[in-house]
Design a protein with these regions (language model features):
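Non-catalytic, solvent-exposed segments at the cell envelope interface
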Residues: 1-274
């Protein structure tokens, strides 16, 4: 869960929601572990139990009022199960400044683009802040990585989700390059004010070691297509994504471990996947 609390605002939205699944393939002779990442669009219109219909990015904040029932992550998990048939058991919630600090702690990351990226985000003064990258390899510090992962007004959620998955892979590659796993306890301490999780430090180290041992073809990603989801405008004017075809949606969820590796998927900078 990627949260974006604003200064002076006690509420927040989780504009980044990723489901990470691991298939250890322990029962398959010669099986190799596979990791799958599903990006859930922030504007997906869902039923929020106990609240009504709304964007899925509202659910984490709404659920935080239900601490005895697991809070926001538990409510998001319930919605993911109801909507996608995906059951989640653990969570990590990180604020945007946590991403900035992590990338800077690694000394920056490199992403490769097959065409220029020209993105926008509102600046709060009636205009836009711009973020431009040329085609080819681009080095990103923490501030640039945040823009790469969050700007979307020149494209849409589909493009941003694709970029977010590529950024996760770039972070993994950089962590391996500098042998960062032994420094995870120090990173945990340094970033502790920017994230919450029900994982222990030992859990994180164990998952990091698993990730470091995987080849590129063992890490897959799903960004939902326009076969599954469609843009619409609600009666109140809200622009949201609704499920166009449940069968197509579930087929894309089921393809999680069969899709192209994240490392082979350049960001869909033009917008929608088809």
């Amino acid at each position: 869960l990627g949260a974006d609390p604003r200064p002076g605002d006690k509420s927040w939205r989780t504009d980044t929601i990723m489901v990470v699944a691991i298939d250890y393939q322990k029962d398959i002779p010669g099986g190799r572990p596979q990791i799958g990442v599903i990006s859930v669009p922030r504007d997906l219109w869902v039923n929020i139990p106990g609240y009504g219909n709304g964007r899925i990015n509202q659910a984490d904040y709404i659920g935080e009022g239900r601490k005895p029932n697991g809070g926001g992550p538990a409510l998001v998990s319930e919605i993911l199960n109801n909507t996608l048939g995906v059951r989640t058991t653990r969570y990590v919630r990180i604020r945007q400044e946590g991403l900035v600090e992590l990338v800077d702690a690694l000394g920056g990351v490199t992403v490769t683009l097959d065409c220029p990226l020209n993105e926008l985000t509102p600046n709060g003064r009636g205009g836009y802040n711009r973020f431009n990258l040329p085609a080819g390899e681009n080095f990103l510090d923490g501030a640039a990585a945040k823009k790469f992962a969050t700007f979307r007004y020149a494209s849409n959620d589909f493009s941003r989700a694709s970029r977010q998955q590529q950024l996760i892979w770039a972070i993994r590659e950089r962590a391996l390059q500098i042998d960062a796993i032994p420094n995870i306890p120090q990173l945990w301490q340094a970033l502790s004010k920017t994230f919450t999780t029900d994982l222990s430090l030992l859990d994180v180290i164990r998952f990091a070691r698993l990730g470091s041992q995987l080849d590129a073809d063992q890490v897959h990603g799903v960004v939902f297509s326009t076969r599954a989801l469609a843009n619409t405008v609600m009666s109140g004017g809200a622009q949201v994504l609704i499920i166009r075809s449940r069968s197509a949606l579930m087929a894309e969820v089921d393809s999680l471990f069969a899709g192209k590796p994240i490392a082979d998927q350049l960001p869909n900078l033009a917008g929608f996947t088809s």
